[in-house]
UniProtKB/Swiss-Prot annotation:
Protein species of origin: Sinorhizobium fredii (strain NBRC 101917 / NGR234)
The protein, known as: Uncharacterized protein y4fB
Keywords (A to Z) from UniProt: Plasmid
Any one GO MF annotation of this record: endonuclease activity
Matches recorded under PANTHER family: ENDONUCLEASE G, MITOCHONDRIAL (PTHR13966:SF5), ENDONUCLEASE RELATED (PTHR13966)
Entry keyword annotation includes Ribosomal protein: no
Keyword Transmembrane helix appears in the UniProt entry: no
Length: 664
């Protein structure tokens, strides 16, 4: 949790006084609040006046429905750490068409925004079960404004128009309108926060919450903030703080601990009434610290800061952000919306007929594809990536017996070029999968991108009928699993390196049907040895030069059996090339079998027999054997650098310790 930088006793005294305060009966301010409430769409009657001055604590029943509507726009944000597998979490909410608001200390740069995943609907349903979530990516190139954490600590960033799986538009979640005018609440009135505390399911804090201090006209810096008593935790950063009319009053930003000076050093009061030095207390669980209040950034000040930043010379203007400012300041409402309405979006429940139509549409498989120019500029596999040049292999006679390469629109050859990898596809209608793939890996520049919802796309450069899609994989009568998984030939993370935008492009490129092959689910999800070969060889060849070029593909055989019109491979192969610090090339070849599961496919029961990761299922083999079996012809440099010296038929691998490779 971010900690308030205001640490003086005066603030503590003002907060304490605010906890006991009742709303002032100032006719002018009262009228302002009633006008705000009416504009927000919450409804106004005589009881509202009594509620605003603290005489009664009743609200209309539509308060609950409007709260549910508001909650749709609130999301959980995940930002992977620069290194390792850890992540930072926060809360955010939609504030306009395709615009998200959170804290700067959650997303502080466009680079972080590109890595982030935004998840809507991570919450429990009426029966206590998790709902299906929807994930989106951010697009800071379409709009990005931020203020540092030691200033107003906010980030406004554009979000993609459609979800990762392409099935849900962001407009389905509505948005929470920001109003730059003041007068929406008063000290002593109630506050509500919708949040994802500790990255958990969506929660609402609505009991015993009051606004306890509102700005400070005598101090311009403090005047940017508002203080309130409410339960929050780590992960709540970036949450929306509401009035009873569900108007956003401020952006949750920090906690205010109960501070004491002891022997000239700052201590914090803990919930057990003891104290601890601030440097220790800041690392304690939030429920161990006695918090005086929470601190939020006032929306009026936030919008004013956005206006100032976008007006600065050289700032990259965004239509989305310009429209936000125009709407929030009352100049021009968002197109198609009612001015001032605080919650914008579709109703909670559609008409029954519409629900049936929507459900039927969801049941129909969606065929995802990219625009024709989507892959323009992709360089693909580079033969000069390693110090020793390694060209793409060619298709020999044995390979061409199983089909011919698919013709690629706009290419002089038959190579599909993606970000950091290439694919040559077999156009045989009984195969429709890669002859081989080739990828360059730079382990020193790997980027930790979280895996989102797997959505596979058809490549527009090759006719769709030459690509195996969902029709090969789904609706199989095997309990809880499809018998064949969509298996990556180029591993998802292998090409994900370099500058964030490039790494994300590479990640997305791996989800092309051209890079997919049918792999028995137990093999695909459990083959730790097979999936870990690249990592092992990268980091066991040279400490500094962690680069590799990897070739992989299915082994086509005459005795492959047919499933749904496609001949299923029984084996997959892989050739890995690395260099040491002296630029010496080393290669090694491997095969893995799913033979037990690709013959006599038993869809009436789960498969039994040896798991493909057990001894005898993974083999290290001579590169020459892979060439002989596949008909994929590699350059002489690959053959002569083979580190394997065992039997010509290969050697079974039990663990990576059995691999014959150049030792450091």
């Amino acid at each position: 949790m971010e900690i308030s930088k205001f640490a003086d006793e005066q603030l503590a005294d003002q907060i304490a006084a605010g906890r006991e305060a009742v709303p002032e009966v100032d006719p002018i301010r009262l009228i302002e609040q009633v006008v705000h409430r009416a504009r927000a769409g919450a409804g106004v009657d005589f009881d509202v006046f009594e509620s605003l001055i603290g005489e009664i604590d009743l609200v209309e029943i539509n308060y609950l429905e409007r709260g549910l509507m508001a909650s749709r726009a609130v999301c959980r944000i995940n930002v992977p750490a620069p290194v390792g597998d850890s992540s930072d979490w926060g809360t955010g909410f939609l504030i306009g068409p395709r615009l998200l608001l959170t804290n700067n200390h959650v997303i502080d740069s466009a680079e972080d925004a590109l890595k982030a995943t935004v998840e809507f609907g991570y919450e429990l349903d009426a029966e206590g079960r998790l709902k299906r979530t929807t994930r989106f990516r951010l697009s800071p190139q379409d709009g990005f404004v931020t203020s540092p954490r030691d200033a107003l600590d906010y980030t406004v960033v554009a979000i993609e128009e459609n979800s990762e799986d392409g099935a849900t538009p962001i407009s389905d979640f509505g948005f929470l309108r920001l109003d730059a005018r003041t007068g929406k609440t008063e000290v002593g009135q109630y506050a509500t926060i919708i949040q994802h505390p500790d990255a958990k399911t969506k929660r609402i804090s609505l009991r015993e919450n009051k606004f306890v201090k509102y700005g400070d006209e005598a101090d311009p810096e403090r005047d940017n903030f508002l203080w309130y008593s409410s339960d929050t935790a780590n992960g709540s950063s970036g949450a929306a703080v509401f009035t009873d009319a569900w108007q956003v009053v401020c952006l949750h930003h920090a906690g205010v601990p109960d501070r004491r000076m002891i022997d000239g050093k700052e201590h914090w009061v803990l919930t057990d009434k003891t104290t601890a030095p601030a440097r220790i207390a800041i690392n304690l669980p939030v429920d161990k610290v006695h918090w005086l209040a929470n601190e939020g950034v006032r929306i009026s000040k936030l919008i004013a800061d956005v206006q100032e930043r976008i007006a600065a010379p050289g700032f990259a203007r965004s239509t989305l952000v310009d429209d936000l400012v125009a709407d929030a300041t009352g100049v021009k409402a968002f197109a198609g919306t009612t001015p001032g309405e605080s919650i914008v979006g579709p109703p909670l429940v559609a008409a029954p007929a519409l629900r049936l139509v929507a459900a039927e549409a969801r049941r129909r498989p969606t065929r995802h594809t990219h625009p024709a120019n989507y892959f323009d500029g992709r360089e693909g596999y580079r033969s000069d990536f390693l110090p020793v040049e390694i060209p793409l292999p060619t298709l020999g006679v044995n390979a061409l017996r199983h089909g011919s390469p698919a013709k690629v629109t706009g290419a002089a050859d038959d190579v599909l070029r993606y970000q950091h990898f290439s694919v040559v596809l077999n156009a045989n209608p009984k195969r429709k999968m890669a002859f081989y793939t080739a990828v360059n890996i730079d382990g020193a520049r790997w980027t930790n991108l979280e895996r989102g919802n797997d959505v596979w796309f058809y490549d527009p450069r090759i006719p769709e009928e030459l690509q195996n899609g969902d029709e090969l994989y789904g609706d199989e009568p095997v309990p809880s699993k499809n018998y064949f998984d969509r298996g990556h030939l180029v591993r998802r993370l292998d090409p994900v390196w370099g500058e964030i935008r490039v790494a994300k492009q590479a990640n997305d490129d791996t989800f092309q049907w051209t890079n997919c092959s049918p792999q028995y689910w137990g093999f695909n999800q459990g083959a730790d040895l097979w999936q870990g070969l690249e990592n092992f060889l990268l980091y066991n060849t040279d400490d500094e030069n962690v680069q590799a070029s990897v070739f992989s593909g299915p082994l086509f055989r005459a005795d492959d059996e047919e499933h749904r019109g496609i001949l299923i491979p029984q084996f997959f192969w892989k050739v890995i090339a690395v260099t040491d610090k002296n630029d010496r090339l080393y290669t090694s070849g491997y095969m893995v079998s799913q033979q037990d599961y690709a013959l006599d496919i038993p869809f009436e029961r789960l498969p039994v027999g040896p798991n493909s990761t057990k001894p005898g299922q993974n083999f290290q083999v001579p590169v020459a054997k892979i060439i002989e079996d596949t008909g994929i012809v590699f350059a002489d440099e690959i053959l002569s650098a083979d580190a394997y010296s065992g039997p010509s038929t290969g050697r079974a691998l039990r663990t990576v310790a059995d691999i014959q490779h150049p030792r450091r």
